Amino acid sequence: MERTFLMIKPDAIQRNLVGEIISRIERKGLKLVGAKLMTVPQALAEEHYSEHTDKPFYGKLISFITSAPVFAMVVEGEDAVDVSRHIIGKTNPSEATPGSIRGDLGLTVGRNVIHGSDSVESAQREINLWFKEEELSSYEAPRDTWLYE
């Protein structure tokens, strides 16, 4: 099974959207295998967003992501990266499809409620950055036989 990294951002935490977001992810057949509520250390935020260091929004992004708790998680399922990207929606909530997490709950590009890995390679890098292997729990759920061929 494929895994991906998702992070519910501070704006969603402050708006009490964690339960709704997780519910949408689970209803799509993805299984939560690791999760933690945490305040992000500066160094972790900088490493996570290292690809954006030269962009004008970088400083604000780091300040935002370290300003309040996030809910970091790893989910597992068939095509987990693509499935999660689809239900998350486009980065800009005004361009995201209605029914997607960002389309329904996001406010602006800077307050778009959730981060999701954009590729299998990014997912692996981000999972390794945020979680130790012993913090992840793979398991078989009875529903798996109904979800996957």
Curated annotation (Swiss-Prot):
Its cofactor is Mg(2+). Its EC number is 2.7.4.6. The keyword Aminoacyl-tRNA synthetase does not apply. Keywords: ATP-binding, Cytoplasm, Kinase, Magnesium, Metal-binding, Nucleotide metabolism, Nucleotide-binding, Phosphoprotein, Transferase. The active site is at residue 115. GO terms for biological process: CTP biosynthetic process; GTP biosynthetic process; UTP biosynthetic process. CDD domains: NDPk_I (cd04413). InterPro entries: NDK-like_dom, NDK-like_dom_sf, Nucleoside_diP_kinase, Nucleoside_diP_kinase_AS. GO terms for molecular function: ATP binding; metal ion binding; nucleoside diphosphate kinase activity. GO terms for cellular component: cytoplasm. It is an enzyme of class 2 (transferase). SMART domains: NDK. It catalyses: a 2'-deoxyribonucleoside 5'-diphosphate + ATP = a 2'-deoxyribonucleoside 5'-triphosphate + ADP; a ribonucleoside 5'-diphosphate + ATP = a ribonucleoside 5'-triphosphate + ADP. Homotetramer. Belongs to the NDK family. This is Nucleoside diphosphate kinase.
